[in-house]
């Protein structure tokens, strides 16, 4: 009985350690990435996994060492894993609709067709026109505040 308790405590500790490591990677990604879409990806995907691993580790620890099952931990686990991706999706969608800057690794626009509408045909002039319209929209939008 004592050996299984130690094994489960070790599993809980490893899950807590993995969750902390993934949260650190998420924080580095939030600081390092260039635009709102990459940052939201880093904030959502890895932090959701880190919270999942951390709460499962805490749940295992409480079950093994105290002998009770925490419904609060289970509910918080479900709540965070449902609301975090949905909330960040809404933030990214609002940023896209407001014309937020999208990071491109290089200036070659031949592979950027997914970011453009079909009538722009991936031309540099069309991208510049789109950026100019976006800047005019931003100036108009933020001057009224």
UniProtKB/Swiss-Prot annotation:
Assembly behavior: May form a heterooligomeric complex that consists of seven subunits: mnhA2, mnhB2, mnhC2, mnhD2, mnhE2, mnhF2 and mnhG2.
Family: Belongs to the CPA3 antiporters (TC 2.A.63) subunit G family.
Pfam entry (one): PhaG_MnhG_YufB
Keyword Phosphoprotein belongs to the record: no
Name of the protein described by the UniProt record: Putative antiporter subunit mnhG2
Gene Ontology molecular function terms on file: sodium:proton antiporter activity
Locations listed in the record: Cell membrane
Organism of this sequence: Staphylococcus aureus (strain MRSA252)
Keywords: Antiport, Cell membrane, Ion transport, Membrane, Transmembrane, Transmembrane helix, Transport
TM region positions: 11-31, 51-71, 72-92
Membrane topology: Multi-pass membrane protein
GO CC, alphabetical: plasma membrane
InterPro entries on file: PhaG_MnhG_YufB
């Amino acid at each position: 009985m004592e050996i299984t308790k130690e094994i489960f405590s070790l599993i809980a500790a490893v899950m807590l350690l993995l969750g902390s490591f993934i949260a650190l990677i998420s924080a580095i990604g939030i600081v390092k990435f260039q635009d709102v879409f990459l940052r939201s990806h880093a904030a959502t995907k890895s932090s959701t996994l880190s919270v999942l691993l951390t709460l499962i580790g805490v749940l295992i620890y409480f079950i093994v060492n105290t002998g009770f099952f925490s419904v609060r931990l289970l509910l918080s686990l479900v709540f965070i894993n449902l609301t975090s991706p949905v909330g960040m999706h809404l933030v990214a969608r609002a940023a896209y609709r407001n014309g937020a800057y999208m990071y491109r690794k290089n200036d070659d626009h031949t592979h950027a067709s997914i970011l453009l509408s079909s009538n722009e045909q991936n031309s540099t002039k069309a991208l510049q026109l789109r950026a100019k319209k976006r800047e005019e929209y931003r100036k108009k939008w933020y001057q009224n505040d």
